[in-house]
Swiss-Prot record:
Belongs to the SmpB family. InterPro entries: SmpB, SsrA-bd_prot, SsrA-bd_prot_CS. The lineage of its organism: Bacteria, Bacillati, Bacillota, Bacilli, Lactobacillales. The keyword RNA-binding applies. It is found in: Cytoplasm. This is SsrA-binding protein. HAMAP family: SmpB.
Amino acid sequence: MAKKSHQENNDNLIAQNKKARHDYFVTDTVEAGLVLTGTEIKSVRAHRVNLKDGFAQVRNGEAWLMNVHISEYDNGTYFNQDPLRNRKLLLHKKEINKLVGALQDKGVTLIPLKMYIKHGYAKVLLGLAKGKHQYDKREAIKRREQNREIERVMKHY
């Protein structure tokens, strides 16, 4: 039996940052592991994650995921952590150095696009992104509307 690709199996998708591609031009992506506590991974498996305001930084040769909200586990008692705490990202040194070089450019940031479970481990897909201006967003909306209209007309022929 053929191995399923990541795109075919969306059962493991935990959270997706839908506004990211609307607000940013995403140029490159990289997959990173997450260092989580026991109660945090239980909340992740329960899909209680919000990536909306999250971003990543490289400090002292280590990558950190900031401002990602992982809700407290209901049965966690005193083992629960702060929902917005900084979480370490697991990347190879070469990948971190590549990101440091890319982040030197003005206006480039690192944002989480998706969080998913892969082989039992929580992973986050990070995107190197540059912010869009308002007129870029309007242009994208116009282009999308034109394509929808063309598809609607072509459907009848």
